[in-house]
From Swiss-Prot:
SUPFAM superfamilies tied to this protein: Periplasmic binding protein-like I (SSF53822), Periplasmic binding protein-like II (SSF53850)
Positions occupied by motif PDZ-binding: 1237-1239
Free-text function comment from the UniProt entry: Component of N-methyl-D-aspartate (NMDA) receptors (NMDARs) that function as heterotetrameric, ligand-gated cation channels with high calcium permeability and voltage-dependent block by Mg(2+). Participates in synaptic plasticity for learning and memory formation by contributing to the slow phase of excitatory postsynaptic current and long-term synaptic potentiation. Channel activation requires binding of the neurotransmitter L-glutamate to the GluN2 subunit, glycine or D-serine binding to the GluN1 subunit, plus membrane depolarization to eliminate channel inhibition by Mg(2+).
Keywords, in A-Z order: Calcium, Cell membrane, Disulfide bond, Glycoprotein, Ion channel, Ion transport, Ligand-gated ion channel, Magnesium, Membrane, Phosphoprotein, Postsynaptic cell membrane, Receptor, Signal, Synapse, Transmembrane, Transmembrane helix, Transport
Record's bilayer topology term: Multi-pass membrane protein
Glycosylated position list: 70, 73, 337, 438, 539, 685
Protein name, as recorded: Glutamate receptor ionotropic, NMDA 2C
Subunit structure: Heterotetramer. Forms heterotetrameric channels composed of two GluN1/zeta subunits (GRIN1), and two identical GluN2/epsilon subunits (GRIN2A, GRIN2B, GRIN2C or GRIN2D) or GluN3 subunits (GRIN3A or GRIN3B) (in vitro). Can also form heterotetrameric channels that contain at least one zeta subunit (GRIN1), at least one epsilon subunit, plus GRIN3A or GRIN3B. In vivo, the subunit composition may depend on the expression levels of the different subunits. Interacts with PDZ domains of PATJ and DLG4.
Primary location: membrane
Naturally occurring in which organism (per UniProt): Mus musculus (Mouse)
Chain positions covered by the region annotation Disordered: 918-988
């Protein structure tokens, strides 16, 4: 009766409380029933806080109801719950599900499936038994499912690389699901999990203890995972302690089910026990109840905002179960997505939290639960060590199966990386390791560590040893030094960790030596090493003279100074004296019989053959010269092919590597003797430094200032040129050289090793692990496992021999020398250009006037003709068209020499060079002497009568600049001039005198000539148009022809380029214009012709002194011919040197005017005063009326388009034209000075 009285009183109190509520107030309030699983002090304290006033911060009014379930009888529990649901309008239930209330949770799940009332468990004790829940149940749990706990437990195993483990379960409900979950996770993972043993024991009261002991003693796994209840866990750990499975050498992991309450762990639980709980494991019962009530209130508030009213209360247990109403289903959906105080309470359809935050806890040495890890959003964050393996004095606990291993980061043996930022764990093929920080927690109990991931050659050796020898390990990085050195009597580094028993083992690039072997034990060496030297390849800098390095300097000198010059001179000499080629004879002035092949052309020919240049060249004609050129061409092929074949080897970047023979090399022993001093160093506190310090004192003293903090710093110093050589362990250096980017680092002698030794595993003195580890290492060497690991970790791409010679593109550094050569050539050209202008504009004016200049002129002309030759002209039968662009410089020189020969013979020099020089000097003095003025009459050879013209003659082409303007002269008496008179183009008189001398064919349109006769007309008109005065002032004598016989061509910019067709067309037009009538008027003439020959004043009166003399009453020395005007005066060579005016160029003569005269050389020109009658040596032009022309001489004419002048024409004219005893002195002087002006 007493058992039924309690629930009855409880229901009576609940009904009274519900009846006391106002109607209106109850409709706006959410009723929540809180069911406690026990009636302890915590539950009593929580009940006192369950008042509406404690939930005022929630959006809705809360009416809490409490109920305690002290009896585990299912019938009594159902009576209480159903009575509560029938008496009160309850919206939801909050249930305290401890681990000992699994039956209550199952009953509540059944009630929820029948009444559709939301039930929220807040402690997580029912998470295991309610997998899965009843269909249609609205049971929600703040705890985590068994599957989620297994996920975190396996993450802890993965974190420490505990791949081998055993599973022990009891017959507690859910153990089959647990085993199934373990196998599913192990099979789905990419890690090679090894499930060593699976035991299912009867751990309840009265179970077979002997069988349990026997099975537990068969377990040989260092890691064990157990599944049982709290009471069964106490029995299991007690039996495991007797079987030797409890202690520092074994790790136990259990789910939340085995813990129960975390307030007071049982005494049988071992230190270091690991479990997984929710983040609310430290919250009080009152806080958990408040979270449950808030979730129901927030869900109801969300429902009211959508539908405008609160959800309907739950139904009665006595009513017939039916389908879930839409309102209850909608309210349940609103409960699945709730956020409270910044925490996400989203539930899955199975009733568990979607993203729960779990905590990994471990039982420390003080018998308290301590958080060592946190699982948040799929990432595990662990704090090291997982279990307290150290005492308060940091001394490790004696463990026969678990080892603490110290290591040191050094590639490739130990490579340290950060964890994966996405998962927070280590990627496959890596092992979790820790690095101790320099500070501690505020409590001072646990030293914090930084989680890292380690991999490498030594890590793979360690993992293989752990599997073969069967031990677990805790890996950490040393922070108080390097490998190990004794400093002031204290060992540091890995040696110190092992020596002072802070670590059971040390593995890494630890060299075995005698000093270390005295205090610790080493295993057999697993890697052969020693001391090696690493250097850096120098940056490939190509010398600017790299393109010249295929041949030695002696070969280049022999090629271009000796061979090219000698062969060029030889070819030239053979060609010079060849009977079929050019014979350069300057003294006789012979015309060339063939092409001109000079020494310059010979050098150009040989140079073009050497480099296969497609340039215009002139080939020799002699057989001997051709043979020499063929031999040179064969030589050039061999020379160029050899140069090209060896050029690529010198144009690539030259890399220099320091070579040393060993530690006793003079570069190490006497580094100061090198320039600059040799710089080398190592990493201190290692076996390399100890070896050098013990054997080479002076070497160690020098290298101390160049020591590096780490291998990476040393490699950087080598590449930057701060270090010349780095001395270190051969195994490390070979790896660094093989993995170096760009293969800039190399070890001397292809990895030559000095003081050969090996790497070993350090263990404590007289350790019982030494024999087992030595046998395992020897087994790895015999099976080839070590060689496989060396291939994976210790080899690099730079060790491949095919990469020793690497091809690369030639950049600007490779071709710098060629560009430098071009820049130097441009600079020299600029200097020569500046010097040329300086000499031309400044220095040449300061040259004193001396008669030696004429000799220098002849000498320079000879040298010029030697190197440039004389142009060979075609047959004179057909004069070529003028080359307006080239100027025919070579032809002019030859003509000048021929004319000089005739003039010298006329001046009676008799071939003597000295007499010729004196004659030229006398002529110059006579020209500079003052001339007396004469007022007497001048005699003039009669010529054809002229007709006055109103204006002066202008150049052809329509130009407005006069051809010549008369200089104003004082009036003088008429003079008599003997010579050719100036013609009058507008008047045709005295034609009978011309027709008698020259036959004329007359047609219906006038007089016509044959083509050959017309070609002879221009030269005749010029050669006979000469005149000398018997008496005229010497000051007016220019000493040179009035118009240049061989004028220099104008500038290309001002000169229109005319071809043969244009020139022939102009000649035809002029001939047609003059042939239209017997007496053309000035107005009827073409503008180009009329302007060229108009004159401003009438022709003078009669000239006397000839048979056909005509009076010249108005004749004056300065008014009748163009040549005597000062504007057309051409300076001599001497005057050009003194005054800076080029010889043979008029000071005021314009380029286009000069072109006109040069182009129309067949037109009549004024050479003296105009006479009315033609001289006996002249004749009328058959096609140009009013002009006269000289007779032809052996077919030589000065026609259109040619600059040739026969040497015998002037001589014949001097005898036949005027009928005098040779030329007067003035005329001869004028001819010689003409040669000088041409030069």
């Amino acid at each position: 009766m007493g058992g039924a009285l309690g629930p009855a009183l409880l229901l009576t109190s609940l009904l009274g409380a519900w009846a006391g509520l106002g109607a209106g107030q109850g409709e706006q309030a959410v009723t929540v029933a809180v069911v406690f699983g026990s009636s302890g002090p915590l539950q009593a304290q929580a009940r006192t806080r369950l008042t509406p006033q404690n939930f005022l911060d929630l959006p809705l009014e809360i009416q809490p109801l409490t109920i305690g379930v002290n009896n585990t009888n299912p019938s009594s529990i159902l009576t209480q719950i159903c009575g509560l649901l029938g008496a009160a309008r309850v919206h939801g239930i909050v249930f305290e599900d401890n681990v000992d209330t699994e039956a209550v949770a199952q009953l509540l799940d059944f009630v929820s499936s029948q009444t559709h009332v939301p039930i929220l468990s807040i402690s997580g004790g029912s998470a295991v038994v309610l997998t899965p829940k009843e269909p249609g149940s609205a049971f929600l749990q703040l705890g985590v499912s068994l599957e989620q706990q297994l996920q975190v437990l396996f993450k802890v195993l993965e974190e420490y690389d505990w791949s081998a483990f055993a599973v022990i379960t009891s017959l507690h409900p859910g153990h089959a699901l647990f085993l199934e979950g373990v196998r599913a996770v192990a099979d789905a993972s990419y890690l090679s999990w090894r499930l060593l043993d699976v035991l299912t024991l009867e751990l309840g009261p009265g179970g077979p203890r002997a069988r349990t002991q026997r099975l537990l003693r068969q377990v040989d796994a260092p890691v064990l995972v157990a599944y049982c209840s709290r009471e069964e866990a106490e029995v299991l750990f007690a039996e495991a302690a007797q079987a030797g499975l409890v202690g520092p050498g074994h790790v136990w992991l259990v789910p939340n089910l085995a813990l129960g309450s975390t307030d007071a762990p049982p005494a049988a639980f071992p230190v270091g026990l690991i479990s997984v709980v929710t983040e609310s494991w430290r919250l009080s019962l009152r806080q958990k109840v408040r979270d449950g009530v808030a979730i129901l209130a927030l869900g109801a508030h969300s429902y009211r905002r959508q539908y405008g009213t609160l959800p309907a209360p739950a139904g009665d247990c006595r009513s017939h179960p039916g389908p879930v109403s839409p309102a209850r289903e909608a309210f349940y959906r609103h409960l699945l997505n709730v956020t409270w105080e910044g925490r996400d309470f989203s539930f899955s359809p199975g009733g568990y939290l979607v993203q729960p935050t779990m905590v990994v806890i471990a039982l420390n040495r003080h018998r308290l639960w301590e958080m060592v890890g946190r699982w948040d959003h799929g990432v595990l964050y662990m704090k090291y060590p997982v279990w307290p393996r150290y005492s308060t004095s940091l001394q490790p606990v004696v463990d026969s199966r678990h080892l603490t291993v110290a290591t040191l980061e050094e590639r490739p043996f130990v490579i340290v990386e950060s964890p994966d930022p996405g998962t927070g764990g280590c990627v496959p093929n890596t092992v979790p390791c820790r690095r101790q920080s320099n500070h501690t927690f505020s409590s001072g109990d646990i030293t914090p560590y930084t989680k890292l991931c380690c991999k490498g050659f030594c890590i793979d050796i360690l993992k293989k040893l752990a599997k073969v020898v069967k031990f677990s390990y805790d890996l950490y990085l040393v922070t108080n030094g390097k490998h190990g050195k004794r400093v002031r009597g204290v060992w540091n580094g890995m040696i110190g960790e092992v020596y002072y028993k802070r670590a059971d083992m040390a593995i890494g690039s630890l060299t075995i030596n005698e000093e270390r072997s005295e205090i610790i034990d080493f295993s057999v060496p697993f890697v052969e090493t020693g001391i090696s030297v690493m250097v850096a390849r120098s940056n490939g800098t190509v010398s600017p003279s790299a393109f010249l390095e295929p041949y030695s300097p002696a070969v280049w000198v022999m090629m271009f100074v000796m061979c090219l010059t000698v062969v060029a001179i030889t070819v030239f000499m053979f060609e010079y004296f060849s009977p079929v080629s050019y014979n350069q004879n300057l003294t006789k002035g012979k015309k060339s019989g063939g092409p001109s092949f000079t020494i310059g052309k010979s050098v150009w020919l040989l140079w073009a053959l050497v480099f296969n240049n497609s340039v215009p060249i002139e080939n020799p004609r002699g057989t001997t010269s051709k043979i020499m050129v063929l031999v040179w061409a064969f030589f050039a092929v061999i020379f160029l092919a050899s140069y090209t074949a060896n050029l690529a080897a010198f144009m690539i970047q030259e890399q220099y590597i320091d070579t040393v023979s060993g530690l006793s090399d003079k570069k190490f022993q006497r580094p100061q003797d090198q320039y600059p001093p040799f710089r080398f160093g190592t990493v201190p506190n290692g076996s390399t430094e100890r070896n050098i310090r013990s054997n080479y004192r002076d070497m160690h003293t020098h290298m101390v200032k160049f020591n590096q903090r780490s291998v990476e710093d040393a490699l950087t110093s080598l590449k930057m040129g701060k270090l010349d050589a780095f001395i270190y362990d051969a195994a490390v250096l070979n790896y660094m050289a093989g993995k170096d980017e760009g293969c800039k680092l190399v070890t001397i002698g292809s990895g030559k090793v000095f003081a050969t030794t090996g790497y070993g595993i350090a263990m404590q003195k007289d350790s019982h692990w030494k024999r087992a580890i030595d046998l395992a290492l020897l087994q790895f060497l015999g099976d080839g496992e070590t060689q496989k690991l060396e291939t994976v970790w210790l080899s690099g791409i730079c060790h491949n021999e095919k990469n020793e010679v690497m091809s690369s593109k030639l950049d600007i550094d490779n071709m710098a020398g060629v560009f430098y050569m071009l820049l130097v050539a441009m600079g020299l050209a600029l200097l020569v250009f500046a010097w040329e202008h300086l000499v031309y504009w400044k220095l040449r004016h300061s040259v004193p006037s001396s008669s030696q200049l004429d000799f220098l002129l002849a000498f320079s002309r000879g040298i010029y003709s030697c190197f440039n030759g004389v142009q060979s002209l075609p047959s004179p039968a057909r004069p070529p068209s003028p080359d307006l662009t080239a100027g025919s410089a070579q032809a002019n020189v030859l003509k000048m020499l021929q004319a000089a020969r005739d003039m010298v013979s006329t001046a009676d020099v008799s071939g003597s060079l000295d007499r010729a020089t004196r004659t030229i000097e006398n002529w110059g003095n006579n020209r500079r002497a003052p001339a007396p003025t004469t007022s007497g009459p001048r005699s003039c050879t009669p010529g054809p009568p002229g007709q006055p013209s109103p204006s002066g003659w202008r150049p052809p082409g329509g130009g407005r600049t006069p051809l010549a303007r008369r200089a104003p002269q004082p009036p003088a008496r008429p003079a008599t001039c003997a010579g050719s008179p100036q013609p009058d183009v507008s008047r045709a008189s005295c034609r009978h005198a011309w027709d008698a001398r020259w036959p004329v064919r007359v047609g219906h349109q006038g007089s016509h000539l044959s083509a050959s006769e017309r070609r002879a007309l221009p030269e005749r008109s010029l050669l006979h148009a000469h005149c000398h005065y018997s008496s005229f002032p010497r000051a007016e004598r220019s000493g040179r022809p009035f118009l240049p016989l061989f004028p220099e061509p104008p500038e290309p910019d001002d000169l229109p380029l005319l071809g043969p067709e244009q020139l022939a067309r102009r000649e035809a037009l002029l001939r047609a214009a003059w042939a239209r009538g017997p007496r053309p008027r000035h107005a009827s003439l073409p503008s180009s012709v009329a302007e060229a020959f108009t004159r401003s004043n009438p022709l003078p009166a009669r000239c006397t002194g000839h048979a056909c003399a005509c009076p010249c009453p108005q004749s004056r020395p300065s008014c009748r011919h163009v040549a005597q005007t000062q504007s057309l005066r051409l300076p001599s060579y001497r005057e050009a040197c003194v005054e800076g005016v080029p010889a043979g160029v008029a000071a005021t003569w314009q380029p286009r005017q000069h072109v006109c005269l040069h182009t129309h050389t067949h037109l009549p020109f004024c050479w003296g005063t105009v006479c009315r009658h033609p001289p006996p040596c002249s004749s009328h032009s058959p096609w140009l009326i009013g002009t006269w022309e000289p007779p032809s001489h052996r077919g030589r004419t000065l026609g259109l388009g040619t600059g040739y002048r026969d040497s015998g024409v002037l001589e014949e004219v001097s005898r036949e034209a005027c009928g005098t005893q040779g030329f007067p002195r003035s005329c001869t002087w004028r001819r010689i000075s003409s040669l000088e002006s041409e030069v």
